[in-house]
Amino acid sequence: FNVEETQYTKIVLGKVDATDADFGQNANLTYFIQPSSQDLPFEISPWSGVFSVNGELDREKEDKYVLTVVARDNGHEKKLSSSVSVEVLVIDVNDNSPQFFKYDDLIQWTHSETHDLSNNNFNSAMMIPLYKATIQENAPIGTTVTRVYANDSDFIGNGNGLILYSLPQRKNQHTLFSIDSKEGLITTTGRLDYENQ
């Protein structure tokens, strides 16, 4: 079974079905998960074999469950059983934000002109990491200023954990810095003048 990570309340994933060639009680089957554990977010109907998820699935904690489901007949003298492995793959959803690290400080950032930013995926006030760097005003264009670092605990294989960096810029403002979208390396793209800024 494949199922997305989230919180579930008795959602049916499918059915485990077994047959028995005997008759009467000897052919009536009871299903159960072995070993039975209260910690697992799965359950099976003992009579129908309907397999459900009931609880939280978090791919960052557990990406796959392999369970043993037993089908046992209800014979009076001797109960016979058979088992099958059930694999549940937890599919990643984009539920974690990228987190910066190796920064120098945390500051509260408030911007009254949020609507003027061309890349305005920001709240008007937030705590943001601050990277500090110094550079000479006569540094040539293309000089490395600093590097920023971030990670995302989502699965990178489907793109949810892939991080791309960008620098928000004011509309119609001369750009002095750029960032490598993959590496987080910030470089100069214009001439810096200490007297102007």
What does each model-identified segment do?
Residues F1-Q197:
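Extracellular cadherin-type adhesion modules in metazoan precursor proteins
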